[in-house]
């Protein structure tokens, strides 16, 4: 019998902050399971979830507006600790008898708060001391409204000159509110505060660890599918790879992985996937060479969105054909992760989230009645990677830069041709190889090469040549919602350019993309 790793859990109510998923990831990093729900949950849903504590997230709305979101009143009647962050603090204050006003001064960015009263939330936590020995905390503010009167049974714990109630607390009820964001790294002691709330005040044990998550997932897979056969579309990406390893551990040869080689992968990627999962780990893999089929479907198409749809449609067709060849397969496995689940819930309820969903296998033939196995659906991407390491997958594969689902189909601008893909593969491999050699690969968030369908004149020896252009792209980002172009050293860029032009016959010019996001997107298409 595996340990119940969901026994202690935190409920996070989402009021729309761009940082809400980060709050959830921080709680998970503390070894405690949590779920992220929309703010308007019912009392019955909260009771059913049975949280050890509740966090109210930040949000973009103003609590002073008539129809702005409010926490369900049951949150404050459930008898569990409650932690309000930014907007969450403001709605807590208003709902419990305090007062919030729109402020003339927006407070955004770094601030230093002074701790004026003792509280379990910040006891012994400090970044510096005032002249008279009071603790100071470096925090990250992002708010327009501010609490101007706290509920009568609360005390002021910390303040700034412009924010008299930066932290408030009712120690008896274990209710806490902070006007800053403890989840961001700019709040230097933020993790300590979250740990104090989750581990000490809510008394949650650290049961949510990679090894225990694996044991739990394996037990659940076995319980769900029994001795039935399962099919999985293996792409070689992080999510499908970790899904494959979990399923293989749980059901062994009852798993069949279908690897569709669409001709749009990175250099030698198909061989690497087959070697690692087939030869090294011993998984049962069906290899489908489908390059010609994908390229013929893409012939003549220049529109990026149309190309994405064609690649998705052909993949589903190929996968379906392979699935129909297999006998007695009862289950389809997918590498759905928790942000995909959140996105689906947001779409269903009409509530906006900032996550761009990725799509897995998609439709199956109507004649195939299969159940769905999604062993990663409770996990964030960083958790999936940690589990992959625990399962023996190589670090370089798990922590590689993101690669788009349509692959080189959206990195070859305009029409996709085999010649263009082959040139791009080789150029991109040189760029990535040089980044690794210069110890720059892990210092940028994403790096890749783009094929431009334009010819440029060049000189080789005594002759002129008229060949293709590629652009190098490297960005630095925390959340991929915004990004800065990476300031790579000029001598490094020169070395990459020289290698590509000299070693890849057919490319005569290399440029470097210095566009940020916004206004540009990270990918060109």
Curated annotation (Swiss-Prot):
Pathway: Purine metabolism; GMP biosynthesis; GMP from XMP (L-Gln route): step 1/1. Disulfide bonds: none annotated. This is GMP synthase [glutamine-hydrolyzing]. The active site is at residues 86, 181, 183. The keyword Cell inner membrane does not apply. Keywords: ATP-binding, Glutamine amidotransferase, GMP biosynthesis, Ligase, Nucleotide-binding, Purine biosynthesis. The keyword DNA damage does not apply. Residues 208-400 form the GMPS ATP-PPase domain. It is an enzyme of class 6 (ligase). GO terms for cellular component: cytosol. InterPro entries: Class_I_gatase-like, GATASE, GMP_synth_C, GMP_synth_GATase, GMP_synthase, GMPS_ATP_PPase_dom, NAD/GMP_synthase, Rossmann-like_a/b/a_fold. ATP binds at residues 235-241. NCBIfam families: guaA_Cterm, guaA_Nterm, PRK00074.1. Homodimer. Pfam families: GATase (PF00117), GMP_synt_C (PF00958), NAD_synthase (PF02540). PANTHER family: GMP SYNTHASE [GLUTAMINE-HYDROLYZING], GMP SYNTHASE-RELATED. Catalyzes the synthesis of GMP from XMP. It catalyses: XMP + L-glutamine + ATP + H2O = GMP + L-glutamate + AMP + diphosphate + 2 H(+). Residues 9-207 form the Glutamine amidotransferase type-1 domain. GO terms for molecular function: ATP binding; GMP synthase activity. The lineage of its organism: Bacteria, Pseudomonadati, Pseudomonadota, Gammaproteobacteria, Enterobacterales. Its EC number is 6.3.5.2.
């Amino acid at each position: 019998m595996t340990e119940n790793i969901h026994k202690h859990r935190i409920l996070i109510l989402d009021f729309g902050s761009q940082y809400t998923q980060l709050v959830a990831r921080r709680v998970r990093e503390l070894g405690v399971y949590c779920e992220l729900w929309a703010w308007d949950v019912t009392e019955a849903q909260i009771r059913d979830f049975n949280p050890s504590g509740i966090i109210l997230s930040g949000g973009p709305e103003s609590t002073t507006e008539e129809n702005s979101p409010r926490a369900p009143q049951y949150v404050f009647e459930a008898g569990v600790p409650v932690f309000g962050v930014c907007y969450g603090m403001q709605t807590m204050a208003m709902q419990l008898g305090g007062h919030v006003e729109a402020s003339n001064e927006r407070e955004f960015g770094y601030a230093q708060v002074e701790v004026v009263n003792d509280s379990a939330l910040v006891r012994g936590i400090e970044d510096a001391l005032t002249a008279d020995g009071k603790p100071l905390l470096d925090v990250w503010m992002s708010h327009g409204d501010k609490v101007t009167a706290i509920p009568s049974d609360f005390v002021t714990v910390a303040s700034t000159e412009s924010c008299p109630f930066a932290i408030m607390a009712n120690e008896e009820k274990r209710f806490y509110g902070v006007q800053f964001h403890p989840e961001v790294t700019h709040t230097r002691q933020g993790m300590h505060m979250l740990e104090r709330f989750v581990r000490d005040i809510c008394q949650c044990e650290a049961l949510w660890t990679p090894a225990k998550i694996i044991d739990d997932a394996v037990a659940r897979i076995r319980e769900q599918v029994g001795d039935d056969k399962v099919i999985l579309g293996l792409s070689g990406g992080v999510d499908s790879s970790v899904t494959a390893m979990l399923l293989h551990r749980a059901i062994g040869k009852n798993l069949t992985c279908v690897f569709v080689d669409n001709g749009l992968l990175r250099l030698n990627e198909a061989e690497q996937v087959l070697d690692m999962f087939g030869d090294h780990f011993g998984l049962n893999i069906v290899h489908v060479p489908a390059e010609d089929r994908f390229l013929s479907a893409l012939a003549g198409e220049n529109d990026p969105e149309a190309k994405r749809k064609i690649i998705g449609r052909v993949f589903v067709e190929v996968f379906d054909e392979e699935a129909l060849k297999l006998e007695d397969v009862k289950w389809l496995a997918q590498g759905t992760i928790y942000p995909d689940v959140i996105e689906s819930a947001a779409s269903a309820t009409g509530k906006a989230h900032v996550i761009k969903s990725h799509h897995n296998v998609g439709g199956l033939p109507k004649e195939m009645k299969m159940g769905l196995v999604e062993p990663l659906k409770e996990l964030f991407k960083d958790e999936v990677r940690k589990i992959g390491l625990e399962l023996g997958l190589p670090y370089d594969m798990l922590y590689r830069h993101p690669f788009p689902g349509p692959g080189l189909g959206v990195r070859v601008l305009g029409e996709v041709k085999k010649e263009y893909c082959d040139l791009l593969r080789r150029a991109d491999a040189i760029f990535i190889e040089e980044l690794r050699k210069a110890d720059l690969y892990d210092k940028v968030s994403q790096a890749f090469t783009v094929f431009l369908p334009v010819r440029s004149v060049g000189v080789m020896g005594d002759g002129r040549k008229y060949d293709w252009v590629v652009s190098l792209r490297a960005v630095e980002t925390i959340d991929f919602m915004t990004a800065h172009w990476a300031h790579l050293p000029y001598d490094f860029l020169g070395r990459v350019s020289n290698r590509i032009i000299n070693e890849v016959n057919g490319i005569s010019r290399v440029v470097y993309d210095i566009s940020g996001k916004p206004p540009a997107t990270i990918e060109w298409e």
